[in-house]
């Protein structure tokens, strides 16, 4: 989801090593240069991102409503979106520049990520073309049309 909707990279825990091969194959087939970074502690990711001038945006159902903050987020040029699970350390809330809620009800972290990426980019990510793709889908009202590039 993050790759398809315009993210440049994703940080994952070591337990998710199998994702790397899958995403490398997706890059080869469908284009793009999406990066997967494994095993970097969350605190270091946030510290390094801040040092690079990124704004830290934590997606949580306990944050400020996305619709109230999205205009400000659109004005930021460098973002790190933090998506946690049910047991996010409290320090993440305090170290983030923004704590943003898609809704104040339980929901999927992936759904929140997709909605935030879509809203921040005003839907422009849906028009994105991926460079160096081996395959490309041609829109079709019925059936599947895939061409080799």
Which positions does each model-derived feature cover?
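Short, solvent-exposed amphipathic alpha-helical segments in soluble enzyme
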Residues: 1, 27-28, 72-75, 97-98, ...
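RNA substrate-binding interface of SAM-dependent RNA methyltransferases
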Residues: 1-61, 121-126
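Short, well-ordered alpha-helical microsegments
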Residues: 19-20, 43-46, 66-67, 89-90, ...
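Short secondary-structure transition/capping segments
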Residues: 21-26, 69-71, 112-114
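Long, charge-patterned amphipathic alpha-helical coiled-coil/hairpin "stalk" segments used as oligomerization
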Residues: 63-102
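Structured adenosyl-cofactor binding patch, chiefly the S-adenosyl-L-methionine
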Residues: 92-144
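Terminal targeting/leader modules
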Residues: 145-149
